[in-house]
Design a protein with these regions (language model features):
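Charge-dense, intrinsically disordered terminal/linker segments
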Residues: 1-67
Length: 67
């Protein structure tokens, strides 16, 4: 899923993940947070991104951390 998020940011084009449209702003926030956390938390984030509910929680968390 991280590859898809990076693709959304790179191409500036929304895409569907788990049946949800993900816009560039949300994808960018998620990628930024992912890149800033340590390896252990990156693994946890990758695990969360495998389910729709986890993906939504991750998106909400990432958006709350972007100022």
């Amino acid at each position: 899923e991280m590859a898809t998020l990076r693709s959304i940011v790179d191409n500036r084009q929304a895409e569907k993940i788990h049946g949800m449209m993900v816009d560039m702003f949300t994808a960018s926030a998620m990628v930024q947070v992912y890149d800033k956390v340590n390896d252990e938390n990156q693994a946890k984030m990758r695990e969360m991104l495998t389910t729709p509910k986890g993906f939504q929680r991750m998106a909400d968390f990432a958006l709350s951390k972007i100022s």
